[in-house]
């Protein structure tokens, strides 16, 4: 389920807010300059659909965001349980970093959590299938798909190189609860 948990940055055991009310989440996220939306596919996506079929199913929404925000390219990333590359990728995504462009992810399937580090708070934003999450450029953050990640995401970019992180060197993410997929 879509969820927002707000922590004190200096005291990860102190939860300031925990909610799964989408309207509350959308308001809090917008106040941070971030974005969350719910999308529906224009037509069903079959299991094992190609990347092109996935992108086509959400073409209307993707085109709208491209017009609004200047995104020039996108791709599909799929991580399934047992992926031998996930531990290395997870280690990289768990390091606090920033981007020179917004980090835009739409969850086609599965779930994952972005952690936004702003001032004296950390906002854990859990997205699920149907959620579009956008972290503004320059915002310190990290991502976790859990120990056995299971998600398919559409990613949108303005940078032709795709995902380029600038790591802060701050180990703050080590102090916060890792994301665990609810059973």
From Swiss-Prot:
Residue sites binding Fe(2+) per the record: 97, 99, 103, 141
Cofactor stoichiometry and binding remark: Binds 1 Fe(2+) cation per monomer.
Short name of one Pfam family: ARD
Pathway where it operates: Amino-acid biosynthesis; L-methionine biosynthesis via salvage pathway; L-methionine from S-methyl-5-thio-alpha-D-ribose 1-phosphate: step 5/6
Enzyme Commission identifier(s): 1.13.11.54, 1.13.11.53
Family: Belongs to the acireductone dioxygenase (ARD) family.
Subunit structure: Monomer.
Protein name: Acireductone dioxygenase
